[in-house]
């Protein structure tokens, strides 16, 4: 009987540690973290920016797009589809910033009810910050984000 108690005593903490590790590794949906509405129809606009450093002049080049349902419904739907499909992995506490001299993407989706929505900052290597917590984006989500940016560039340039 004593061995059974000892076994149960050590089984409980081991199960809790395993559960914590699985929760840590479980990917989180971007739309849930950003507190977005249930459907893309409830989004008023999406602000999409790409900030790229110019290493020769030490300045930053910012390209910004504001997509609305009235002007660009297809593009807005494409960005919203990405926001609803993308997954963030491995949350890590951080100081809320990304310190890297590389390319950064900034996405902000504004709901139709004008409620406050967080912004997601994404570096080219897949690191992201939402509400001061660092995450990693999957490679296929980063590839889709690059494709959306290229699509926006071909339309507006």
Language-model segments: residues:
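Function-determining sites in protein domains
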Residues: 2-157
